[in-house]
């Protein structure tokens, strides 16, 4: 998620009156809400004593809605109207989720913008689905706290981009929540363990949930948290362990593998057994295939670990990638925090300990740790805590503009801590140009065609001037939640235009990793392509200037000079049709050399016109 500047917003007028605030972990599989009660971060429970709320929503024909456990119970009978894992779809376009579509039991509606889901209650967006989950969590908080919270800190993955963060804020707004901050999940976990109050160092946050895996490397320095690197696998989690065990059980027991009721029974038993074996060495599984007597199967922890070992090993490449991106060695990691229910599995903890060469922190329930950190942060933001807490996130990819020739001018490089604002001046390319098109892009490549387009807007009303005279100041501003605003202003008139970037789709961690990898693989090639494009832009500028000068003052040249200049201009035109940057640059320089007599005479002529009819005294003035 985006890291943020958090300053003390002020304390309550009455020092004994605490303001109500909540922290929400809006998860892919489960969600939960917490608050600081009597100075103790506490996760809130429902009427049945459960603190986890399944992130599942079921829409009913009569307009009713089931959220959480009732929705899960009906998933088998009503899969098309029961929406799970909506978080995977937040801020995503229809084209982005084609790889997921075949694995989703519900129907996606084709169209532009954010993906929508077809239900008996009409089309629903992931934002609307998430809002229902947040609404239930808010109601739980109101009942527990005895009043409306002033605001909420909601956690998001560190790799969430502008679109995904904005979608999360929109969902909260629909649920009637005032969002104090969006907080990176790994940062929230670190806050929960009080790492912000300890010594400086570098920490790894290993987050293995039900459906996703994330690894984040944080640096704590002078009270500031900074996310150095993130990596992960959005298709890896505890569910994969359940499926691995379920497949083995079906092979052992037989039964009709195509029968959804049988598969659901086996999967549920597998999940229960996995959870039990986190505490005991052996457990019994009871299966009742259709038309057959019930059968008991003894399952040991050792057998489970052998079955799930390939699953948990899949998390290690991402760990290595995060360390490599952060430029760190294993011995530089001060501590490892475990997040996510799947990290309760002893085999996972053993593997993490072996990989990082140290015992991970496990004192706080891994299901609760993110919500607890969010609650602590929310408590600080409403003024209940005296100490400042500064949290910083970084941009996952560079932000920039398209310039002439399809080149990218990076304004804010990747890994820049946010919030941040950067400005740069640009100018016009042609004489009399009165408008400029601004194209905002994201990525590490040198050419626009290889980057992701974020937004386009125009600045109009630029005073007509010669090419290169106008000054257009473009400012990029990324706020604490990672949302981008771009403003363009012509400095002499104050004419301005701006856009708040809210893309209709987002990027996941694999897409960000792919974009970074492409920038490394094609680095040398991009340098060559950029050099060629820059040479062509400069060549076109020289050719345009030559046309303008000849149209106005060709009579200042003698025939030999005009012939030499025409010949140089033709050579430049021919060079521009080729792909040799060196040839283009040499041809442009030859034109400028041949044009020197014309340039000098134009200046002399302009000077004579300026002083004609004026006295020496007037010129002195």
From Swiss-Prot:
Alphabetical list of InterPro entries matching this protein: ATPase_NBD (IPR043129), Heat_shock_70_CS (IPR018181), HSP70_C_sf (IPR029048), HSP70_peptide-bd_sf (IPR029047), Hsp_70_fam (IPR013126), ISC_FeS_clus_asmbl_HscA (IPR010236)
GO molecular function, one term: ATP-dependent protein folding chaperone
Entry-linked Gene3D superfamilies: 1.20.1270.10, 3.30.420.40, Actin, Chain A, domain 4, Substrate Binding Domain Of DNAk, Chain A, domain 1
Keyword field contains Iron-sulfur: no
Pfam family, one: HSP70
Record keywords, A-Z: ATP-binding, Chaperone, Nucleotide-binding
KW Protein transport (keyword) present: no
Gene Ontology biological-process annotations: iron-sulfur cluster assembly
Described function: Chaperone involved in the maturation of iron-sulfur cluster-containing proteins. Has a low intrinsic ATPase activity which is markedly stimulated by HscB.
Sequence similarity: Belongs to the heat shock protein 70 family.
The protein's name in its UniProt record: Chaperone protein HscA homolog
Organism: Acidithiobacillus ferrooxidans (strain ATCC 23270 / DSM 14882 / CIP 104768 / NCIMB 8455) (Ferrobacillus ferrooxidans (strain ATCC 23270))
């Amino acid at each position: 998620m985006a890291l943020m500047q958090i300053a003390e917003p002020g304390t309550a007028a009455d020092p004994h009156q605490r303001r109500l605030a909540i922290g929400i972990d809006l998860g892919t599989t489960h969600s939960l809400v917490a608050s600081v009660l009597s100075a103790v971060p506490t996760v809130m429970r429902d009427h049945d004593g459960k603190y986890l709320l399944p992130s599942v929503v079921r829409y009913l024909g009569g307009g009713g809605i089931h959220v959480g456990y009732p929705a899960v119970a009906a998933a088998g009978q009503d899969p098309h109207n029961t929406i799970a894992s909506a978080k995977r779809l937040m801020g995503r376009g229809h084209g982005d989720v084609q790889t997921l579509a075949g694995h989703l039991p519900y129907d996606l509606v084709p169209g532009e913008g954010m993906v929508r889901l077809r239900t008996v209650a009409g089309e629903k967006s992931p934002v609307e689905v998430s809002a229902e989950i947040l609404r239930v969590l808010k109601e739980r908080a109101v009942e527990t706290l005895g009043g409306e919270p002033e605001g909420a800190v909601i956690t998001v993955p560190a790799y969430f981009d502008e679109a995904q963060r904005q979608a999360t804020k929109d969902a909260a707004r629909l649920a009637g929540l005032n969002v104090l901050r969006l907080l990176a999940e790994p940062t929230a976990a670190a806050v929960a363990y009080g790492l912000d109050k300890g010594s400086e160092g570098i920490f790894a946050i290993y987050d293995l949930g039900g459906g996703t895996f994330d690894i984040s490397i944080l640096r704590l320095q002078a009270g500031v948290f900074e996310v150095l690197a993130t990596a992960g696998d959005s298709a890896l989690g505890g569910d994969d362990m359940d499926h691995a065990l379920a497949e083995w059980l079906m092979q052992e027991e037989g039964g009709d593998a195509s029968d959804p009721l049988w598969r659901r029974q086996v999967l549920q038993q597998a999940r229960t057994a996995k959870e039990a074996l986190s505490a005991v060495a052996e457990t019994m599984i009871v299966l009742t295939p259709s038309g057959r007597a019930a059968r008991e199967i003894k399952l040991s922890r050792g057998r489970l670990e052998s079955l799930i070992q390939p699953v948990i090993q899949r998390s290690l490449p991402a760990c290595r990638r995060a360390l490599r991106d952060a430029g760190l060695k294993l011995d530089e990691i001060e501590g490892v925090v475990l997040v996510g229910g799947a990290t309760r599995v002893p085999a996972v903890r053993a593997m993490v300990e072996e990989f990082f060469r140290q015992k991970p922190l496990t004192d706080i329930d891994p299901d609760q740790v993110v919500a607890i950190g969010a609650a602590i942060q929310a408590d600080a933001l409403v003024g209940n805590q005296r100490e400042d807490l500064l949290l910083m996130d970084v941009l996952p990819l560079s932000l920039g503009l398209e310039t002439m020739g399809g080149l990218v001018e990076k304004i804010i490089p990747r890994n820049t801590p946010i919030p941040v604002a950067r400005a740069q001046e640009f100018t016009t390319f042609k004489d009399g140009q009165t408008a400029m098109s601004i194209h905002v892009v994201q990525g590490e490549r040198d050419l626009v065609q290889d980057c992701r387009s974020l937004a386009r807007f125009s600045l109009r009303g630029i005073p007509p001037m010669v090419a290169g005279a106008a000054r257009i100041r473009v400012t990029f501003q990324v706020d604490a939640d990672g949302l981008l605003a771009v403003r363009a202003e012509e400095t002499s008139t104050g004419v301005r235009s701006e856009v708040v970037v809210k893309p209709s789709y987002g990027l996941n961690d694999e897409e960000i990793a792919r974009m970074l990898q492409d920038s490394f693989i094609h680095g040398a090639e991009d340098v060559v392509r950029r050099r060629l494009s820059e040479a062509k832009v400069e060549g076109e500028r020289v050719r345009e200037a030559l046309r303008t000068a000849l149209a106005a003052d060709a009579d200042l040249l003698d025939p030999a000079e005009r012939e030499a200049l025409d010949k140089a201009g033709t050579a430049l035109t021919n060079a521009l049709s080729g792909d040799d940057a060196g040839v283009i640059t040499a041809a442009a320089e030859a034109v400028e050399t041949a044009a020197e007599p014309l340039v000098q005479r134009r200046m002399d002529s302009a000077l004579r016109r300026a002083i004609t009819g004026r006295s020496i005294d007037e010129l002195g003035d």
